[in-house]
Every structure is written in structure tokens, then in C-alpha cells.
Amino acid sequence: MSQTLLDSLNQKELTETSCTIEIQAAFILSSLATFFGGLIILFLFRIALKSSRSWKYVKGPRGLLELFSSRRIEANPLRKLYFHGVFRQRIEMLLSAQTVVGQVLVILVFVLSIGSLVIYFINSMDPVRRCSSYEDKIVHVDLSFNAFFSFYFGLRFWAAEDKIKFWLEMNSIVDIFTIPPTFISYYLKSNWLGLRFLRALRLLELPKILQILQVIKTSNSVKLSKLLSIVISTWFTAAGFLHLVENSGDPWLNGRNSQTMSYFESIYLVTATMSTVGFGDVVAKTSLGRIFIVFFTLGSLILFANYIPEMVELFSTRKKYTKPYEAVKGKKFIVVCGNITVDSVTAFLRNFLHWKSGEINIEIVFLGETLPCLELETLLKCHTSCTNFVCGTALKFEDLKRVAVENSEACLILANHFCSDLHDEDNSNIMRVLSIKNYYPQTRVIIQILQSQNKVFLSKIPNWDWSAGDNILCFAELKLGFIAQGCLVPGLCTFLTTLFIEQNQKVFPKHPWQKHFLNGLKNKILTQRLSNDFVGMTFPQVSRLCFVKLNLMLIAIQHKPFFHSCCTLILNPSSQVRLNKDTLGFFIADSSKAVKRAFFYCSNCHSDVCNPELIGKCNCKIKSRQQLIAPTIMVMKSSLTDFTTSSHIHASMSTEIHTCFSREQPSLITITTNRPTTNDTVDDTDMLDSSGMFHWCRAMPLDKVVLKRSEKAKHEFQNHIVVCVFGDAQCTLVGLRNFVMPLRASNYTRQELKDIVFIGSLEYFQREWRFLRNFPKIHIMPGSALYMGDLIAVNVEQCSMCVILATPYKALSSQILVDTEAIMATLNIQSLRITSPTPGSSKSEVKPSSAFDSKERKQRYKQIPILTELKNPSNIHFIEQMGGLDGMLKGTSLHLSTSFSTGAVFSDTFLDSLLATSFYNYHVVELLQMLVTGGISSEMEHYLVKEKPYKTTDDYEAIKSGRTRCKLGLLSLDQTVLSGINPRKTFGQLFCGSLDNFGILCVGLYRMIDEEEPSQEHKRFVITRPSNECHLLPSDLVFCAIPFNTTCGKSDSSPSIQAQNNSTNATTPLAQGSNFFDSHHADESHDLYPVDDTGERWSQHHHSRVYPLDTLDASDIVQEK
């Protein structure tokens, strides 16, 4: 009995181990025969199909040919429609998981593939060379799985467009090398592992299955699942191959070098090989195994080095940047969203953290829509104490909740200046504002806008509140406003820029002028509440006291008149305005510590203090408060016009004003004064827009302003402004309206307005013209600034300034090339040399010449004044070389270049710093916008957008029109009213004398670089806020804030007559064949740039007609888009 049982066990063991090489070869050859046989058959049918096309009639069944072809025979369309339009379409929908049945089918195939792989793992516990008996139940389960795989393979084969391509797909190869051996095992009544490890490649379908089941939804989850499936399937497949060859041995040695290696040991070997080069405890002994390890090591270097770290990063980053920001009570923070890149974050942190000089008390939370790159992550780590990054978007409430917007101090939105579509960039940022305001209406929002016409939509957003600190920084408006000021007053563009840039680079000046310029760079516009000891004093008195006693330059105040509740900014107000309690003052100073002296000043304690540094907070308890009882404002009825613009006008002051507002018929507001008039004719009537801020004219057709080169003698321009624009029919609009508006400000008389001549593509100006058609004295010359003939045709040699605007953004490989056209145009214009007119000649002569002529030639010719805009500040070295300057201020910074110090170049890169300025002190930005945009404030703009009618008295309408606001200009020391100031050896003496006698506020100097070697081309540089002890030179020009009704001509006898003779703008010098610089160089016969044409206070514009500028319609934006 026992002997019979022993024999039975021995027979079973013999049956399980008797898997000969012939049986193994049968399993392998079945797969190879299926693969290559099927491939040959497909190629033969493809060849037969192509051969049949040469026959007129094809004999035999056609459906079989179509089945194996990648194309279709066009006969019998009804049959094709039936088989391939119905049945085939349903199969494709099943296989693509577009239906519920298809999704179930795909999931079922994946689950059965994993089940077949599990069966392989179970069978791999036995030696590879042992064949399992067919009586094993697991074999029947595996056979049923493979039968289903065969059915699925047939469906895929039927639905495939290209059968040969399908045959070579990875999933097809897996089925071909795993399904046939299963049926062979049924015939041989034995089962062998063989190549069934290839089922592990089905794990690559894992991301698709998880998406169907909606387990993963985010892009990071999909990416992580793909990486994970690639790594795992590679491990299992490589381990299966090693398990097979190491247990079977090399075929040519009949397996004599085989070794027993479990599947787990194979996975261990593969893992060790991927991560390092193995540890030597488990190694491959067969030649096939070692060859496989060699190639697998090379592939694993790529796989492990790229995929594994990326997976780890996804695991850690997802948790790190998706968790909500925890707002700590008492800790202030802001949210920054929009364009979050390395460059934008770098610029923002540099400007934002500078305000507190290293003292960090506000945390910055960046809300980025994508995970930070390595460079940005490194930057954030350098500021880890004050920065946080959260991945999300401001368009979703859940992301806004994660960054706790409702608890933030403000939400700042960054714009991408280098985007290809400025309109889309603005629209996306406007949508962010709308989302933030809808989520929490009280959130303070500061946004960067690229195009000024898009500001209209922000004012219409519910809960937008200017008074709560909501602010708009429009780059096009500010940039072109700066350039326009540089056209009105040479050097003013640089003067204003120096007040907002921060110079941290150490520079060692070699020349005296460099020292003066660098000292000016230290000054900034700062604000400070004024001491209540100044209450009741006039602005000139306070400004003089601050200058002499406190060593501070007070230039403007925020004033609150008694007849309405709003505050308005006033630059250099007249003596009729007296200070109220807690008046906000605007200073040009070098530190916030210095301006605090204006707050601490006490008339009792500091009256005898001579050193401004000693003025600090005093312990005075009892002060004389008689000034507090004094009237806050003392205004003469005849002097109402001395007030400046206010944004809120009460309707209760309305009298006898006839207004008519409509889009088709512009509004007409006629202002009539009761003052005595002379020569009151219709020709003298000025037309203004509805705000009274800008000169207006009826819409002009474009063809009326287009100039022809052949009619040069017909339009002999002099003292005009030439603007070179590089644009075409497809590029983004620059927004020339923002450039023209400051040049058409109403505080200049109609006679003072200079002609503006644009040179550029006519197709481009056709797109811009609807924004410019209501401004007077605008002309267009079709052509290019790169063509000398077009420049000469517009009398560029007689212009007061030639502006070269940068090319609209283009996607280029190098950022150096963005300024190519601007640099070449600058070179083209600088090559022109203008001879000074001889005594017998009334016109100057233009001659092309090299920019590097001898010194004698430089003395004979003069250059055309140029202001070039650069998008890339590093391109300044091209301008320096062409300007003939030797780069005496060494350094790569544009703001340290000689060209910048002379006012010859401008770049808007510093405007990024205004975002931080607007957050800490939005009053400074308000003043800047008022200075560079022609006097309009954000609150006034709110009314302009709505076209809200003003119903006021006649006198106050004159105030509202803004015509009485100060003008910035240049005055010479000898040929203007400044010549009557004595003594005036130092800037301090000049400041006090001009303020006391004329109400003129001196703020800076425009000085010659080399006084000892004067020439026609001599350059001047800007000195911002000179020191009180700065000695003046006879050739100095003075930057001044000049009251509207002040006569600036040198007075010898009658003021009114002298005003008509001497108070001129720069038209006169250029009309005589010279330019602004020559007028002060040769004999300095002309004084002011610019001044009024009228001399007496009461005779300013007896009749003024006011019209609205055409407001931007949303349809125009859509049409332009």
C-alpha cells in the first residue's frame, strides 16, 4: 500500500518536472509564428490591394481585402456604409470608452490582465523548467482570461484603420506573445510560464482606468499616475525576463549555466541595477542575462534619473504648495497673483521689501496658477521669512479662501509686460478683480493694466472703491505720459523718473557733474502730515519755512476745500490757499526720517533751532492754537481761478449752464466770464473736452491730416514734435492717445500747443485714429523713421523734440533685438547735422554726417534733440556709443548712463516699483499720475468714464476745467523774471526769492555737462532737488512749477507788454532756425519753456467751449481685438 502511494508521488513529481526544451520551444515558437505569420499575411494583402488598383475590375471577394487594408475600395458605397459606418463605429465607441458599456469593457480587460499577472506571480514560485499539470485549476482560469483577451483582440483588430500599424502596437505584441501559449498548453496538456510576464505592460493603462473611474482629476495626479505606471511596469517586465533567462540558462549551452532565482530576487536585482550598479549579492550568470543588464542599466539611468525624482517632487510639492495659508492674528500679509514668474517676483520683492529697509512686517503670499520652477523656488527660499507660495488661481473661490483674501491687507495683481496679446492679458486680470470683489467686496485691489482703454471696465466692477485704496496702474498711460512731459520740457522725463527709481549700485564719480547727478538720484517723493503749527499759513509761507528751517522741499499738498467733502492734490498752490489741520504734504527728500521734521515742528520749541537734524518730537504740552481758530481758507472772489482741479463737484452749485450730452452730438459747455474783455472774437474761443482738462476739436477725417512728401513747402513745421512709431496692421496698439493728452492739456493756451507729426505705417494709424481724431494740430506722415527722406519731409531739423517709440512687443529669440528699430532710427536721426543759419540766411541747412566727426565739425553743426524709448534697458550701450558719449558713468544700469542723465532715453522698467509705492502710499502715485497725464486724477477719471455732467457756477466751472493748475517749465536765470532776484548765487537764495516774489517753485536744475567747452551739441544733465548751498551757473536752466497766471518774461517796463514780447514758448527759437538748446547757448534770447502767451491775470480765455473727448466704447475694443 505504502509502496503504491510512493510510486504515485514519484510519478506526479516526474510529470511536473518533465518540461523539456522541445515543449518550451513549442510555447515560444507559437508566439513567434503568430506574430511573423500574421505580419507577412498583412503585407501580402496590402501588396495585393495595391496591385488590384491597376485592374479595371477586381475579381474575387472584396470584403476580405478591405479587412486587411489601411484604405478602402470605393465601390458599393451602401455596403461600406453599413459595415463600416454602423458596426465599425459602435466598436470604436466601445474601445474608446465613450459609452458605459465601453467603459465597463475597458475596465474589465484591465482587471483580467492584472488577474493574469497575479496568476503568473503564483506560478513563478515553482522552478521555471517545471511544467504544471493541466489538471491544475489555475490553468483553466488563465485559459478563460486569455479567451476573453482573444475576443478583445479581435475587436481591436476589426476597428483598426491600419492593420499593420495595429499589429506592431505594444498591446498587440503583449497579446500575441501571451495568448497563443495558453492554447498550446491546452493541446500539450501542460503549462509553462514562458513570456507571460509581458502582461505587466498592461499596467501602463492604469492612468486611463483611473480617469474613467474619476479617481484622479488634476493634471498633477494624472502625471503622477503615468510616472508610477511606467516605473512599475518596467520593473515587473525586466524582472520577468531575468527570471526566465537565469532559470532557463543560455539555449546554446542547453541550460548548463542556469541558476535558481526567484521572481522576488529578480525584482531586487532590477531595483538595485536601476538605483546603483548592483550590490553583488544577486547577479546574472547567463550571457543573455548579463547582456540584458548592460542595456537595462543604460536605460535605467534615464528612467531613474528623470522619473523617480519627478515623482518625489510631485508628492512633496503637491502637499507643500496646495495646503492653505494660515493667517496669524496680528500678522499682516498681502496676496499677489497674476503673472507670477521669476522676473516679476524678483522685481516685486526688490521694490516691495525696500520700503521698510530690511524691516519685514508684512508677509507676501503668492498665488500662482502653476507650480514654481526651480529658479523661482530658489528665489522664494531666499525670502522664506516673508514669502509663501500657494498653487491656485484667483478665479476660483476655493483658492481665494485658501490664501485668506478676506484677511489680507490688499490683493496685488501683476501683469505680463512681454505678452503677445495685451488685450487678453488685461481681460484676464480684470476677471481676477471681479472674482476677488465677488468673493470679498471689501478687499483692497491694486492692479497693473497694460492698455488704458481697459481701465473703463474696472470702474464698472461692483464694490470698486477708489477711496478704500483700490488703484489702477496703467503702464501705457504712465509710460507715454513720461515721454510726453519730456517733449514739453527737455529733461523733465528724467527729472520725474529719478524721483521713483532706487539706486543701490555703488558708483564712484570722476567728474563734478556726475556727483551732482548722483546726489539727485537719492531724492524721492515722500509724504508726511504737516504740523498743526502750520494751520492758517499760506502754502508759499509753509514751503519757504520748510526749505529754510527744515531743509525740506514741499511741492504740493492734499487740500480739502470748505465747499465740498473731497480732497484734491494741488501742486504749488497760490497764496489764497491756507493750510488746514492734518494737511498732507508732498516733499522731495532723501529719507522718510527727514520729512518727519515737518510733523514734529513746533513754533514754540523749534523757533530758535538752526540745525534741522535737531528738530524732533518735543515735550511741549501747551501750544498757542490761535491758528486753529483762523479761517481754513481765505479766497477772494476774483481769485477763484487759482484753485486746481477737484474730482467731486456738488450739483448744488449749478447755475445757468447749458449742457447737452450724447455720443453723436458732443456736449458743449460755454463758460462766460464777467471780466472786461478785448478782442473777444470767435477765433479766440478755445474748445475743451467735457472735463475741461484738454483741448478739443471736432472729429477730423484721417485723410485731412495725412501729409504728402511732395508738399513739404506747404507745411513748413517749426518747433513741432516728431514722433516715430513702428507698427503695422497686425501689431498691438501703443495707445498714442496717452501720449497726446498731456501735450493737449488745457493749462496751455491754444497758441502754446505744438504740432505733433507722427511718422509710421498708415495702416497702423488707421487703427489708432479713432482715439486721436478730436485732438487739434495732429499730422501723419506715412513712411518710416528709417528713411531719411521722410524725416526731412517733416522738417525734423526744426523740431523741438523727436520721440522714437519702441516697437510693439514681438516674439523674438533674443531680448536684445526688441529695440532694433528704435536704435537704428536714433542712429539715422543723429547722423543729421544742422548748420547754424548765417547772418544773410533765414533757414538752417541739413546735411547728413557721421556721428563720429571731428571736434571742428561738432562746433559747426548741432544735433536734433531726441528722446528714445528702450524696452530692454541693457541696450543703453548702443545709445551711448551713437551719442558720442564715452560712458563716463560706468555701469550697465540705464539710470546711470549719461544719455539718461541728459534726458535722451527712457525705459518703463521702473514702473514695476509703483506697485509697492501704491500699496504703502497711494498718494504718491496719485501725484505722479497728475503730473505726467496732464493733471487728471483717478477720481476725476471716474467722472470722465461715466460722462457725468458738471453743473456748477461759471466761476467754479473755470476752476473745474483745470486750466489754472501749475505748469512745469524751464526758466533761464538771465532772461526771465528770475533775473530780478537778488541775491541768487545759490539755489537756496533762488528758491526763496522766486517763491516770495512770483510764487514760482524751483525744484531742480538743467545744467551743462561741460561749461568750459560750449558747443552747438552741448549736453545738459538733470540735478534733482539741488542742495541749498548749490552754487548756480549763469547758463543754468531751472525746473519750475509755474502758476498759470504768472508772467515769466523779463520785466523792464510794463508787465503786460513785456509778457507779450518775452513770454513765449519754444516756438520762437525754432522758428528762427534754431532749437531749444541753441537759444540758451548762443545768446539766450528766449527764456521760458513753456510759458503763457497772456500777461495779465484777468484776461485768460474769456470764452471757452468745452467738449467731451470721445469715450472708448466696448464695441471698439471688441472690434480692435
UniProtKB/Swiss-Prot annotation:
Positions of disulphide bridges: none
Transmembrane segments: 25-45, 102-122, 138-158, 166-186, 189-209, 227-247, 291-311
Phenotypic consequence of gene deletion: Mutant males are infertile due to abnormal sperm physiology with no overtly abnormal nonreproductive phenotypes detected. Sperm cells from these mutant mice exhibit several functional defects, such as absence of hyperactivated motility, lack of capacitation-associated membrane hyperpolarization and are unable to respond to acrosome reaction induction.
Region span, Disordered: 836-858, 1052-1076
Activity regulation statement: Regulated by changes in cytosolic pH; activated by alkalization. In contrast to human KCNU1 is not activated by Ca(2+) or Mg(2+). The auxiliary subunit LRRC52 shifts the activation of KCNU1 to more negative potentials at a given pH.
Entry-linked PROSITE patterns: RCK_N
Keywords, alphabetical: Cell membrane, Cytoplasm, Ion channel, Ion transport, Membrane, Potassium, Potassium channel, Potassium transport, Transmembrane, Transmembrane helix, Transport, Voltage-gated channel
Motif (Selectivity for potassium): 276-279
GO molecular function, one term: potassium channel activity
Domain named RCK N-terminal: residues: 331-473, 718-889
Cytoplasmic side: 46-101, 159-165, 210-226, 312-1121
Family label: Belongs to the potassium channel family. Calcium-activated (TC 1.A.1.3) subfamily. KCa5.1/KCNU1 sub-subfamily.
Subunit and interaction comment: Homotetramer; which constitutes the calcium-activated potassium channel. Interact with LRRC52; this interaction changes some channel gating properties, such as shifting gating to more negative potentials at a given pH.
UniProt free text on domains: The S4 segment, which is characterized by a series of positively charged amino acids at every third position, is part of the voltage-sensor.
Name used for this protein in its record: Potassium channel subfamily U member 1
Organism: Mus musculus
Gene label: Kcnu1
